[in-house]
C-alpha cells in the first residue's frame, strides 16, 4: 500500500465523518453539507475515470445502467414531483442513490491505482467497528428516549450496518483468531439489534464464510476453522440463551417470527401489489409512476426493492434491476479462481440480494461495504495474480 496520507484514505475518512453526523456533530450542519459536496465531486470524477480508463468487470455494466435509471428518474423528480406529500425533499431521492452507489467506483479506481490494499483495511476496519458501535448506542439512546412507559427494548437498524462490515473481515483470512473474534463481535450487535432480516443475513454469511474458509484452507489448518466455528456457535448460543431469559421483547420477536407476523409489512406490500395490478396506464405499467411514488400511495416506502422499483420505474425498472443482479452473479462466479475474492464478493451478493427482498438495499449501501466491494472488483482485474493473494 502507498503512504497512509493519500487520496483514498482522505476519501474514506470524509465519508466516515459525514456518516457520523448526529453523533460527532450536529446532523445536517454546514460541515456535513460541505463534506457531502466534496465526496460527491470526487465520486463522480472517479466514476468517469473508471468507465473511461479501465476495462471493467461485467458487474459495472449492470451498475452503470441501474445508476443511469435512478439518475433519470431522480432528475424528473426534482423538476416535477408534485405528487409527493408536503415537506418531502425532492432532492433526497437522488442524493441517497449517489451516496449509496457512487463510492463503489471510487474504491475500484483507488484499488487499481494501488491506493487501497489489504493494509488499508487493517487500518480502517478497527475504526469502522468503533464508529458503527458508537452509532449503534447513539441510535439506541435516541429511540429509547422516544418510548413511553417502562419498555426500553427496541429494534435497532444499525444492526444492518454491522452486517455490512462482515465481508471486509475476509481480509483477516490468514489470522482466523482476529477474523472470528470480529465476526462474533458483529454477531453480538446484530442479535442485540433484533432486526430479523439482519439476523437472517448474518447467519447466512456466517455459514458461507465458515464453509468456504474450510474449503480453501490448507488441510493442516482446517482443524482451526472447525474449532473457531464451534467456539462461535457456543458463544452465540450463550448470548441467545441469556437474551431469552432476560429480554421479554426478544421472546416477542421470536414468537412473531414463528407466527409469520411481519410487523405490518404484509399489509403494506398488499397495498402496492394491488395498486400495480390495478394500473390501467400502459406507460405507468412499463415505466412506473416516478421516483418515490410509493410515498404518494401509502405515505411511506415499500421497504422492498422490487415493489419500490415496480411502482416507481415499472416493469422496465425491475428488468434493469434483475440484469444488475445477473451481472453481479456472473462477476462473482468469475472470481472462483481467486478464493478469497470469491468469498468476499459472495458475501456482498448475499447481502444485496436478500436485502432487496425484505428491506431497502440499493439506497442503503454503507461506505464500509461499497469500499470492500470496489476493492474486490479492483483486485479481480489486477493483471499480476500475486497481488490477488490476501
Question: What are the roles of these predicted feature ranges?
Answer:
Residues 2-3, 167-244, 319, 333-337, ...:
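Hydrophobic alpha-helical segments of polytopic membrane proteins
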Residues 33-41, 57-78, 84-109, 127-129, ...:
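Aromatic-anchored transmembrane helix interface
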Residues 1-76, 115, 171-177, 381-390:
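Transmembrane signal-anchor hairpin modules in multi-pass inner-membrane enzymes, especially those
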Residues 220-224, 237-271, 291-296:
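Flexible juxtamembrane loops connecting transmembrane helices in multi-pass membrane enzymes
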Residues 59-60, 313-353, 371-380, 384:
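Hydrophobic transmembrane alpha-helices and their immediate junctions
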Residues 109, 113-143, 153-212:
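Alpha-helical transmembrane segments of multi-pass inner-membrane proteins
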Residues 259-313:
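Long extracytoplasmic/lumenal interhelical loops at the membrane interface
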Residues 2, 37-53, 163-172, 318-335, ...:
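Hydrophobic, aromatic-rich transmembrane alpha-helices
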